[in-house]
């Protein structure tokens, strides 16, 4: 079977990203799972290896050489990218120069995917404040990725812990705005997006649970009717599309139903509704997937940890999980061709 090719970036070099990449690629079994293309400042990569006390062999190639390059098992390649910002990096803090570098390396990785050189992208933790200083015009990277890929359909952040995936109909909005932003189409789109992502990650016939909005699932309209007027009609559309969907389940019993029914994915109505339980289940193993974007893109579900830069105490568990999902989804892209 042909291996997928994954682009890997350092995220924000002022944080723990370079250390995490070094620790990840020091593992031979990781390097052999996929063909790996590092998009990074060579000096920052080497600093990460020095911090982590972790070494691995890589080969340096240019962007245009990659199309004819024959990968060697367990040997990543590096496309070295120097930031266009004139100032050097300042470690352990939010800076414009880090933000510029983050956006530039992600653009290179996206271009690799557009050219068909890689099937997925995994980036080390980045900092949104730095990215805004560096030119990001969107509230988060998800909508920036949508712009960069000319994607105008529904997108949402997916959270993953172990074998449980989660999506949400609404996300980074005030609590008072949740109900006005719920719709039958939104519920269906979210279910459908989660279903497609699970299939791309190699899950056959995924089971998806949907959460109710109101206490006790609305109690037949006594505590609210959104379950009847919005959520259930959206679920019915999903069933007609051939998706195996269950619920709507009250928020406080959803995890029990996930375990009982062996659910693969959960659709919630708002940001913290299911992610709280998911993070309790395994915060240190959490992964974020940029849901809906035509290129599979993953990262660890934690931040840059500026205070840990240079200390060699960053734990790579979540980043390794993110890389593994990128490999699986990249394989799904190959299998679709």
Curated annotation (Swiss-Prot):
Origin: domain of life: Bacteria
ATP-binding listed as a keyword: no
Primary location group: cytoplasm
Enzyme Commission identifier(s): 1.1.1.262
Binding site residues for a divalent metal cation: 172, 216, 271
Alphabetical UniProt keywords: Cobalt, Cytoplasm, Magnesium, Metal-binding, NAD, NADP, Oxidoreductase, Pyridoxine biosynthesis, Zinc
Biological processes per GO annotation: pyridoxine biosynthetic process
Pathway in which the depicted protein is active: Cofactor biosynthesis; pyridoxine 5'-phosphate biosynthesis; pyridoxine 5'-phosphate from D-erythrose 4-phosphate: step 4/5
Keyword Metal-binding: yes
Location of the protein in the cell: Cytoplasm
Catalysed reaction equations from the record: 4-(phosphooxy)-L-threonine + NAD(+) = 3-amino-2-oxopropyl phosphate + CO2 + NADH
InterPro entries named in the record: PdxA_fam
GO cellular component: cytoplasm
One Gene Ontology MF term: NAD binding
Function: Catalyzes the NAD(P)-dependent oxidation of 4-(phosphooxy)-L-threonine (HTP) into 2-amino-3-oxo-4-(phosphooxy)butyric acid which spontaneously decarboxylates to form 3-amino-2-oxopropyl phosphate (AHAP).
Subunit structure comment from the entry: Homodimer.
Miscellaneous notes: The active site is located at the dimer interface.
Family that this chain belongs to: Belongs to the PdxA family.
Name of the protein described by the UniProt record: Putative 4-hydroxythreonine-4-phosphate dehydrogenase
């Amino acid at each position: 079977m042909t291996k997928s090719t994954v682009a890997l970036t350092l995220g924000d070099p002022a944080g723990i990203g370079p250390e995490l990449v070094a620790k990840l690629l020091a593992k031979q079994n990781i390097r052999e799972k996929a063909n790996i293309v590092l998009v990074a400042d060579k000096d920052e990569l080497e600093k990460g290896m020095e911090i982590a006390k972790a070494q691995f062999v890589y080969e340096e190639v240019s962007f245009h050489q990659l199309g004819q390059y024959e990968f060697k098992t367990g040997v990543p390649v590096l496309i070295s990218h120097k930031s266009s910002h004139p100032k050097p990096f300042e470690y352990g803090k939010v800076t414009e120069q880090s933000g510029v570098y983050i956006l530039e390396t992600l653009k290179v990785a996206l271009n690799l995917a557009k050219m068909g050189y890689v099937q997925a992208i995994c980036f080390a933790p980045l900092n949104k404040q730095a990215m805004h200083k560096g030119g990001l015009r969107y509230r988060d990277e998800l909508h920036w990725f949508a712009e960069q890929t000319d994607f105008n359909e529904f997108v949402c952040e997916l959270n993953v812990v172990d074998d449980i995936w989660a999506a949400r109909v609404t996300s980074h909005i005030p609590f008072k705005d949740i109900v006005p932003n719920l719709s039958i189409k939104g519920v269906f789109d979210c279910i459908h997006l989660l279903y497609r992502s699970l299939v791309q990650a190699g899950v056959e016939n995924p089971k998806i649970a949907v959460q109710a909005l109101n206490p006790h699932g609305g109690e037949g309209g006594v505590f609210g009717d959104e379950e009847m007027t919005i959520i259930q009609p959206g679920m019915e559309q999903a069933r007609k599309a051939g998706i195996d969907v269950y619920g709507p389940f009250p928020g406080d019993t959803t995890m029990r139903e996930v375990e009982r029914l062996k659910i693969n994915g959960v659709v919630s109505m708002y940001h913290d509704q299911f992610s709280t339980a998911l993070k309790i289940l395994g915060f240190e193993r959490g992964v974020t997937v940029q849901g809906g974007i035509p290129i599979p893109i993953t990262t660890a579900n934690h931040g840059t940890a500026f205070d840990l830069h240079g200390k060699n105490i960053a734990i790579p568990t979540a980043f390794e999980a993110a890389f593994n999902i990128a490999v699986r989804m990249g394989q799904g892209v190959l299998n679709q061709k």
